[in-house]
Amino acid sequence: MDLGEFRLHSLGLDKEKFGRIYSFVDFGNVNYWYENDRRKWDNNQLKENQKLIIDIEKLANFISEFSEQKRFYYGWNPRVKRSWHITIKAEKCGFIKNTKPMQFIKHYVGEGVISRDGRATRKDANGTYIEIPKSNFDVEISVDAIRLLEKYDSFCLFSGDSDFTYLANYLKKNKKKFIVIASGQVFHTLKELADLYINAQNVKGLIASIKETSPL
């Protein structure tokens, strides 16, 4: 057993048990897994000017160790140039990508209200509002999962979103195994349906990198 096989075995990713695995990455969810982490994968403290980010190349390499196909779903922000670069990077790393521009939904608030997450308020003829970014891929992932149903034995989801519960039930009824890799905030029913649940903290060193932040 080589190092890669040992790593997969320790995570519970047994190829004999799960057969052909297809992985579906909801990157809008994955991208924030370690946003508030202040410790590295070796449990040492990050420096003040450091933060953890998802490393798309490392993510692709990790998935390729156990998955026959890797698919990447991401809503890019037309207002942020780097956002589009994420989709380019994913494609270069061998992901089959499904992308669309992010939508911004107006949410009207009372006069003088301050957004908790620091979003700027705007005004139009109907009043004061904040813009909430929205880019769900539960429909696209579900359609692809069903369309490709006969090609895999196990469906691996990188997300803990409750929107995937119905899909999980469908896959289980069709004799497919269901793997969930997600952060601590996982919808409990989704976790219960999983044949294997892997906490994102257990793969931190395999899919994350340290980024130096600019001084204020």
Where are these regions (language model features)?
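Domain-level signal for Mg2+-assisted phosphodiester chemistry and nucleotide/NA-binding surfaces
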Residues: 1-130, 177, 184-186
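Nuclease catalytic cores that cleave nucleic-acid phosphodiester bonds
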Residues: 96-216
